Amino acid sequence: MMSRLHSAARWLQGVSNRRRAIVLLLFIGWAAVHATDGRAQRPTFREEWAAGVTGGINYSTVFFAPKVHQSPMQGFNGGVALRWITERNLGLQLEAGFRQLGWRERFDEQPQYRYIRRMNYVELPFLTHIYFGSDRVRFFFNLGPQIGFLTGESTDENLNGATPNKTNDQHTMAIERRFAWGLCGGPGVELRTSVGYFQLEGRYYYSLGDFYSTRHGDAFSKASPQVFTMRLAYFMPFTLRH
């Protein structure tokens, strides 16, 4: 067993950050599912449907190559969700929402400058919902692919044509690829009451696409965002009539 773990560690050191993120998310999901295999049998399972609303804040940066010095940019998110618990400890969750992400540049040597790019996306995550716990409190992990479409962008800056960073092409470049796709996942806790289910969830999104053209000869060879989200959600269960 230890030799397998050492081999896996050596393999992870040799892969790219993007592949490492994918492998990590898939491993966490696999471990969460198998962690429930040994639990004692409970009363007969019944499928569960719930619909909810979500909202919170997110902090985003962008992986640029060449590198752009940044600080996390704060944005907000909100949306709706539909959840279907298909079997014990496992379900599906479909979401539709709005999220604001982008980047805030750092000018350490010339702090009088400011540059913030905000990008607004409509997003559709398709998630596997893994949970365990009691009838009162559940811990869960959501994991799956996500697609999005850019609906608008805005800039807050005072550069006035100055080029204070080593990389400055992005200051005058509009977003070139409006479609986005990637992987997202994260843990959360759910309090189940007679008036509905209340959630607190953290989530990480890693874009597998670039919003600028990254062909040979372009200004950037990489331009993909990553987003950390903290959000609250309220779900109301309902029953489907057959």
What are these regions (language model features)?
Residues 36-81, 237, 242:
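Short glycine/proline- and aromatic-enriched beta-strand/turn motifs that initiate or cap beta-hairpins
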Residues 56-62, 102-110, 160-170, 209-214:
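Flexible, solvent-exposed coil segments and beta strand-coil junctions
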Residues 63-68, 110-115, 169-175, 215-220:
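Extracellular loop and loop/strand-boundary signature of outer-membrane beta-barrel proteins
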Residues 47-49, 72-76, 118-124, 137, ...:
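Residues that define the transmembrane beta-barrel architecture of outer-membrane proteins
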Residues 95, 180, 185, 192-242:
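Predominantly the C-terminal beta-signal and adjacent terminal strand-loop region
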Residues 1-46, 238-242:
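Cleavable N-terminal export/targeting peptides
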Residues 41, 45, 49, 83-159, ...:
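Gram-negative (and chloroplast) outer-membrane scaffold detector with strong preference
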Residues 56-60, 97-99, 144-148, 203-207, ...:
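Outer-membrane beta-barrel pore domains and translocons
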